[in-house]
Amino acid sequence: IVSPPVCGNYFVEVGEECDCGLPRNCQNQCCNATTCKLIPGAQCEDGECCERCQFKGAGNVCRPRRSKCDIAESCTGQSPDCPTDRFRRNGVSCLNN
């Protein structure tokens, strides 16, 4: 049995763009708690690449490199999420010498 989405339960479900709980409890300025939709003009409501309801610009580092083999990840300007953690390609030496 599949139940319909419920706005106000803190879970983003099918048809919702955000869900910050009941209107009296909502602390998210980007989300309309009554409709579970982003407020007009908002691109996002949460994520490493979301700031003040807008996507951070392309090139903003969202995950710095942690080792010589790691590659720093940057926001794309098109998503609230930081891209998948990536590493240098196989065959490239990254030992600490």
UniProtKB/Swiss-Prot annotation:
Its cofactor is Zn(2+). It comes from the Eukaryota. PROSITE patterns: DISINTEGRIN_1, DISINTEGRIN_2. Disulfide bonds join 7-36, 18-31, 20-26, 30-53, 44-50, 49-75, 62-82. Its EC number is 3.4.24.-. It holds the Pfam family Disintegrin. Binds 1 zinc ion per subunit. Expressed by the venom gland. SUPFAM superfamilies: Blood coagulation inhibitor (disintegrin). The keyword Transmembrane does not apply. Keywords: Calcium, Cell adhesion impairing toxin, Disulfide bond, Glycoprotein, Hemostasis impairing toxin, Hydrolase, Metal-binding, Metalloprotease, Platelet aggregation inhibiting toxin, Protease, Secreted, Toxin, Zinc, Zymogen. It is found in: Secreted. GO terms for molecular function: metal ion binding; metallopeptidase activity; toxin activity. Belongs to the venom metalloproteinase (M12B) family. P-III subfamily. P-IIIa sub-subfamily. PANTHER family: ADAM A DISINTEGRIN AND METALLOPROTEASE DOMAIN, DISINTEGRIN AND METALLOPROTEINASE DOMAIN-CONTAINING PROTEIN 28. This is Zinc metalloproteinase-disintegrin-like bothrojarin-4. It comes from Bothrops jararaca (Jararaca). The lineage of its organism: Eukaryota, Metazoa, Chordata, Craniata, Vertebrata.
